[in-house]
Amino acid sequence: MIDVELNDEGQFLSSEQLQLVKDVLNHAAQEVSLSQQSEVSVTFTTEEDIHELNREHRGIDRPTDVLSFALNDETSDFDPTFHEELGLPNLLGDIVISVPHVERQAADYGHSFERELAFLVVHGFLHLLGYDHMNEEEEKQMFTKQEEILQSYGLGRSES
């Protein structure tokens, strides 16, 4: 099980959509066999705010659809094992999603808002677990896992 902290101060999403985010993350955690109790936060924001975060943290001066900030990565001094020793959940990190991007991309790809939302949630979650798409092999592995999770949840490309 994964504890999900949702931050939707702009009240962009309905209660059903927020529940979908929690359900999809718990499903994804099962699909990747995440055995340790973990925690993740998901923030829903504007295009302007995600643009600022992208510029500040990645040096890319444009908005994006989703950003992930893993607490346990190679560049961090953070030691996640102390949580386990104390019986606390493993803090995976933060996912930030641009709601205007969800709306636009759902329309562009011809599927539902919920399918696009779930896609970006799973994409961000996999980044927190160390998946990436910096080269062709990594991209294939990550995107295959992403689609498997969405398909098994019932939000595959043909089902949305």
Swiss-Prot record:
Places the protein is found: Cytoplasm
Enzyme Commission code: 3.1.-.-
Record GO cellular component, one term: cytoplasm
Pfam families with a match to the protein in the record: YbeY
InterPro entries, A to Z: MetalPrtase_cat_dom_sf_prd, YbeY, YbeY_CS
Cofactor remark from the record: Binds 1 zinc ion.
Gene3D superfamilies the UniProt entry points to: Metalloproteases ('zincins'), catalytic domain (3.40.390.30)
Nuclease is among the record's keywords: yes
EC class of the enzyme, as a word: hydrolase
GO molecular function, one term: zinc ion binding
Keywords per UniProt: Cytoplasm, Endonuclease, Hydrolase, Metal-binding, Nuclease, Ribosome biogenesis, rRNA processing, Zinc
Family affiliation: Belongs to the endoribonuclease YbeY family.
Designated name of the protein: Endoribonuclease YbeY
Organism: Shouchella clausii (strain KSM-K16)
Gene name linked to the record: ybeY
